[in-house]
A protein has these predicted regions:
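Short, compositionally biased
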Residues: 75-91
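N-terminal secretory signal peptides
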Residues: 1-36, 40-42
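Well-ordered alpha/beta subsegment
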Residues: 89-113
Length: 113
């Protein structure tokens, strides 16, 4: 999967699970993602995805997760967490991700590739 942010393309690997497969079926998607906590961008989708949430304990920059059944979250910083997420995939090389997403909201395009 490709994730394009402000003209910069990142390559991501989707996990082999029901949630990732359901998201893949909806691609391509261009989303206006909002800023949260200085470590993530999120968007409440207009549809729900299957869930299998657990607490990962540690979030890594580049993680793509689902919060609840309809909130897509792209993390651009690493940090410990007590929240529960359903894993979807991960950006293979998140170098430059924090700079690409910037501060505030950002348009992000998810596509097959």
């Amino acid at each position: 999967m490709t994730i394009t942010i402000n003209g910069q393309t990142f390559y991501a690997t989707l996990y082999d699970n029901e949630t990732a497969a359901a998201l893949k079926a909806k691609l391509p998607l261009s989303l206006n993602m909002s800023e949260q906590n200085g470590n993530e961008k999120y968007n409440y989708l207009s549809f729900s995805l299957p869930t299998n949430a657990s607490n990962p304990g540690q979030i890594h920059a580049g993680d793509l997760m689902l919060y609840g059944s309809d909130c897509l979250v792209l993390f651009y910083e690493s940090f410990p967490t007590s929240y529960r997420y359903t894993p979807i995939g991960r950006i293979n090389d998140p170098s430059g991700l924090a700079d690409a997403v910037g501060h505030g909201g950002v348009q992000v395009t998810f596509a097959l590739g």
